[in-house]
Design a protein with these regions (language model features):
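Cytoplasmic helix-loop-helix junction between adjacent transmembrane helices
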Residues: 63-100
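Central cavity-lining transmembrane alpha-helices of secondary-active solute carriers
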Residues: 11-25, 211-223
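Helix-breaking motifs and short loop linkers at transmembrane-helix boundaries and internal kinks
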Residues: 32, 53-58, 232, 254-255, ...
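Glycine-rich segments within core transmembrane alpha-helices of 12-TM secondary carriers
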Residues: 92-111, 298-308
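Conserved MFS/SLC helix-loop-helix module at the cytosolic interface between two early adjacent transmembrane helices
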Residues: 19-58
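Structural signature of the two symmetry-related core transmembrane helices
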Residues: 35-49, 235-250
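Extracytoplasmic gate region of multi-pass secondary transporters
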Residues: 167-211, 218-221
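Helix-loop-helix hairpin linking two adjacent transmembrane segments in secondary transporters
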Residues: 97-146
């Protein structure tokens, strides 16, 4: 499989966020949040079993599609379900700890694959392991008593969901999600190339930039989850977004491996909790419409497919990864510009 096909398959996952987010919101209103999450787990588990039963290109594509569907449904339904389990004061911290678990899974994936490489099934043994973990999570949730609030009985539609953008805070946070996901994907593309360009590292070693980045995000999500249980989300957002911007500027001027990895790690720490904060504040602002808010914000995740091609054009035009970093820094200024709005947002539309 050539690089173009591989890239298209990877980017296709963002298509599911665009297509299925709002229909998942509709499903939540019909069968409830908990059942929607259980369905997402079931689809994910089936997707993990397909490569075990038959491993060829066509079946892997089917598995990848099912994985994208399950992931989209989970992303839309899980955070609103959390609002039925924890208080508003602990919502941001709880969502952030969830991001920590997600980051840990991403970080451990390659390590587990390497561990299983010497087994009978080889690295593909990771699929039944992931399927088993998913089934356990599904069973645990299925038997857990959760009292869901019937806060919105009217039917969710595409028009009703997009009408939330009439609220200035929701539209600002929606754009914030676009920026966060776009920059995250852009970073993943840019870091290895930056290390190749400035440190003359071979491609296989240049991937350490992403490893450092994901490790920093994992640590940052854990620390953020603990801190956000006790301290103001708006102050944490201010510090994190400014730290990330300083890190991007530092990367632009860094020329040696140590400094590049330092600023990559610093950016990961700054980035780690911003998605959770925006998501939490959006749901707290419209607590009667959390299903629609969640669906709309997850539509914004599809924006991750927009920025990387633009970075490619800019890099080809100027012939340096520094131009991509400058572009990312300029885009990131939006997150800093959100600071006063994050400070002023009030639940239930009572903003200043």
């Amino acid at each position: 499989m050539d690089a173009k096909v591989s890239g298209l398959i990877s980017l296709s996952c963002f298509l599911w966020f665009l297509i299925l987010s709002i229909p998942t919101g509709m499903l939540m209103n019909r069968i409830g949040r908990k059942k929607t999450v259980v369905v997402s787990f079931a689809i994910t588990a089936l997707a993990m079993l397909i490569p075990v039963l038959k491993y060829d290109f066509a079946f892997v594509l089917v598995a990848f599609a099912m994985l994208g569907i399950g992931n989209t449904m989970l992303q839309v339904a899980l955070n609103p379900l959390v609002t039925n389990v924890v208080s508003a004061e602990k919502l941001t911290g709880t969502i952030t700890l969830g991001q920590f678990i997600k980051a840990m899974s991403s970080f451990l994936g390659p390590i587990l694959a390497a561990m299983f490489a010497g087994s009978v099934w080889g690295w593909k043994a990771i699929f039944p392991v992931y399927a088993a973990v998913t089934v356990l999570a599904m069973a645990w949730l299925a038997v857990s008593p959760i009292q869901e609030q019937l806060i919105e009985k009217s039917e969710i539609t595409f028009a009703r969901t997009f009408s939330l953008l009439r609220d200035k805070y929701i539209v600002l946070f929606f754009i914030g999600i676009l920026v966060l996901v776009g920059v995250d994907v852009g970073m993943g593309v840019t870091f290895p190339k930056l290390l190749q360009e400035r440190c003359s590292l071979p491609l296989e070693k240049a991937g350490m930039g992403n490893s450092v980045y994901f490790l920093a995000r994992t640590v940052g999500a854990f620390l953020g989850g603990v801190v956000l249980m006790r301290f103001s989300a708006s102050k944490f957002f201010t510090a994190s977004s400014c730290l990330a911007l300083v890190s991007l500027v530092g990367l632009i001027f860094s020329r040696n491996l140590t400094m590049i990895l330092f600023f990559v790690a610093l950016f990961g720490l700054g980035y780690a909790n911003l998605f959770s904060i925006i998501f939490s504040l959006s749901m707290q602002k419209m607590p009667q419409k959390t299903n629609e808010v969640s669906a709309l914000l997850i539509v914004g995740v599809s924006g991750g497919a927009v920025l990387p091609p633009l970075l490619g054009v800019i890099t080809d035009t100027f012939g340096t990864q520094g131009s991509a970093l400058i572009t990312l820094a300029i885009v990131w200024v939006y997150m800093v510009a959100l600071i006063p709005f994050v400070r002023n947002v009030r639940p239930s539309g009572n903003e200043n």
